[in-house]
Amino acid sequence: GEHYGDKTPNEIFKLTEDFDADTLVKTLKEAGFKKLIVTAKHHDGFCIWASEATQYDVSGATNYQGGKGDVLADISKACTEHDMDMGLYLSPWDIHDESYGYKDASGKALVEFVDTNNDGKPDKNQPVNGLTWEQVKQQDAKDYNKYYNDQLIEILGNDKYGNKGHFKEVWMDGAKGSGAGYQEYDFKKWFDTIQQYEGIAGNQVDDCMLFGAEAYTTVRWIGNENGFAAEETWSKSNV
């Protein structure tokens, strides 16, 4: 089966004040690692930094460091100290935040997953009650794309995050559970925000590498989650 977390208050986050980011990063550095990609938010929506966009974070939902903790800042400080490049993993799919999906002001869904083949198997998302997609977006009470973009700005626009305030890569995991609500992602908007802070547009030497950003992707997945890749991994291209 599938399990990506739930919407209950975070009661399993038992990180103590003994968390030692410095030893973690130092050990990785000594082992030969050149970059540390930090999962700042996974599919469950819990944020390991002090986010202004939600209370479902390390400062609002846990007692870590008296409710004033910021794990991403701790790791960033250590990466800066040991000059370890950083990548940011920020899951687009979010099962916790109410802005995910399309709902009106009363919380009623504006999109439904329907059976268009009359075979008893739902196969397509479509607007309810004959609405157009444009009307769905107009009636959507909360804009998830803005929520996600605001969190990108919170992190990428704050010099306390990253190695010396900089991230080399942003990882957008494309996973989405079978029961996930329908949500279109504004990759263009997110791409512009990322490069504004971490790319050539932000006076960096190179553009930030992106994974899982559809047409804007620059980092290819090796095809498994086992950590193994062939010595030569070719990517097809239509010439």
Q: What do these predicted ranges mean?
A:
Residues 1-239:
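Mature catalytic domains of secreted/periplasmic carbohydrate-active enzymes
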